[in-house]
Amino acid sequence: MQAYFDQLDRVRYEGSKSSNPLAFRHYNPDELVLGKRMEEHLRFAACYWHTFCWNGADMFGVGAFNRPWQQPGEALALAKRKADVAFEFFHKLHVPFYCFHDVDVSPEGASLKEYINNFAQMVDVLAGKQEESGVKLLWGTANCFTNPRYGAGAATNPDPEVFSWAATQVVTAMEATHKLGGENYVLWGGREGYETLLNTDLRQEREQLGRFMQMVVEHKHKIGFQGTLLIEPKPQEPTKHQYDYDAATVYGFLKQFGLEKEIKLNIEANHATLAGHSFHHEIATAIALGLFGSVDANRGDAQLGWDTDQFPNSVEENALVMYEILKAGGFTTGGLNFDAKVRRQSTDKYDLFYGHIGAMDTMALALKIAARMIEDGELDKRIAQRYSGWNSELGQQILKGQMSLADLAKYAQEHHLSPVHQSGRQEQLENLVNHYLFDK
């Protein structure tokens, strides 16, 4: 079959002096960073949905893209053509991984039977493509939010029959992910929330969602899936309020239902923006809570109240994110999935490459800067100094539960404590970060 991207062989690393827009300037897969290949640090993935499923439509306009697999025709044949183009793209872009929702890769059909049969056929197609190309599945998931049946949610739906349909999709998608060697399975509660409290039983919906997640964990162990289960937090959109609001909220939910050892987090930059947090904050929080799993790398727009899903282009922001990830030991089963789409006006098919190339270069440069911060160790040293008092006898007695509140009150009076505030030196530390970013 003729190549879709027929004007491009492969995207290659040409160095920072290159002016070729279809070449990497900073992402060199084989470059060693802290003793590990850059490709192994970053574990890039391209997503199926924004890249090959979105037709350019928005709330104010119809589809703007002319993709051959989005034209009228036999659904399975079009899905197979889409897979041809997707794996051509993955190969030419040099991404080692990809991600999908079930209905991204397979026609949903008019019944559960059709859904299952179509998906089974496409899983065989994807398995062949993976073997042919060497591209692997970072994670799979089920789309339990687009179909009108999920208007009131999937796991939190007031109708147990809808709950059961969603369970069927998750079983099918997880087993497909397992068969394809996927390293993670993601759960994003697109409509697991509410529009108004006037028709919502919060306790009931929370119990339903908790039981659904428990069943997901049970099924994972039943089929022998060794990958990581991931929840992707988001505060709102499409619902007014979603139950997986942010990393800290999800932690409380997992603790309530005894799932904190079973499920980790897939953190998306744009979702952090919508929650009123920085991307850095959500990554650091997930790590501090022991829940860090994977990343959807993109960016939002602080002036807009919706999920713009733009490609990441801020080295400053992502250097701090990569610094946290490196300090935590790096990715295990997770990676950097580009949950991002070209703009509606970007109608040339090669715009898909420009978006991903810029994002990959951004993350590569961020990685190298983060590595310099790790090697220098100055930020860690400053934090250690700031909290050094907790290594004293008093600090350790407090942390080990050897002092009560009354004991501390007595200690403070007997020792005539009069502590003096020590400067946090925020401005100096911000200057230090700029040194790593901009001084060669």
Curated annotation (Swiss-Prot):
Cofactors named for this entry: Mg(2+)
Keyword Hydrolase: no
Domain of life: Bacteria
Any single GO BP term: D-xylose catabolic process
Cofactor note: Binds 2 magnesium ions per subunit.
Keyword Metal-binding: yes
Protein's cellular compartments: Cytoplasm
Protein name: Xylose isomerase
Naturally occurring in which organism (per UniProt): Escherichia coli (strain K12)
